Amino acid sequence: MSTNDANFMLFSNINDCSYVSCYCEENVWKLCEQVKKTYPSELPKCYAVFVSNERRTVPLWRQKAGRGDEKLVIWDYHVFFMHNPSPNRCLVFDLDTTLPFPTYFHKYVTETFRSDYALTPEHHRFFRVIPAEKYLAEFSSDRRHMRRPDGSWIKPPPSYPPIQTSASTHSLDDFICMKPGKGPGAVYDLLHFVQQFYKPPDRNIGTKTQN
């Protein structure tokens, strides 16, 4: 299928994607790597998105690790992958959601983040959006955040070696940080994140504007 086809999907089967529980930042890095290998022309249209806040307490719904019928969980941070091939089409690939893989941006945001209005300020979600190419070049992690004080693993790590760059062995905190103007990519609050990536259908097309 051509990448210009309206039904084209970068990843057609979630089971073909690299996945290790509780290592969402590496899972998304692997998705970026896969696109670079298989559909390099699409890489400029792809993003890694970190969700967190100053207190690192962000509520997300529809998560496999969540509780209750609505699958609510509070993470310190979360990471998902986005493909934005055209202004009116943006798909979210989240390996940890109970929603379909992928899910259209508006549905994903509506069901996963809902609204900040009903939440206390310390639970408001912020989003660091990083172009996939930049994420591949600058992200690194020695997985220290997944070790207990005695050195044992909180969750088993991926079988492949830690992701490193020539400049850093552990840049994860730079990506989790939600201070605007600091770190890679751009930081948005929920409202501006939606405005940036969701373009509602133009219902005024074909109608005459009255002055």
UniProtKB/Swiss-Prot annotation:
It catalyses: N-terminal L-glutaminyl-[protein] + H2O = N-terminal L-glutamyl-[protein] + NH4(+). One of its GO terms (cellular component) is nucleus. The gene is tun. Its EC number is 3.5.1.122. The keyword Nucleus does not apply. One of its GO terms (molecular function) is protein-N-terminal asparagine amidohydrolase activity. The active site is at C24, H78, D94. It comes from the Eukaryota. Pfam families: Nt_Gln_amidase (PF09764). Keywords: Hydrolase. Mediates the side-chain deamidation of N-terminal glutamine residues to glutamate, an important step in N-end rule pathway of protein degradation. Conversion of the resulting N-terminal glutamine to glutamate renders the protein susceptible to arginylation, polyubiquitination and degradation as specified by the N-end rule. Does not act on substrates with internal or C-terminal glutamine and does not act on non-glutamine residues in any position. This is Protein N-terminal glutamine amidohydrolase. InterPro entries: N_Gln_amidohydro_ab_roll_sf, NTAQ1, Prot_N_Gln_amidohydro_ab_roll. Monomer. Belongs to the NTAQ1 family. The lineage of its organism: Eukaryota, Metazoa, Ecdysozoa, Arthropoda, Hexapoda.
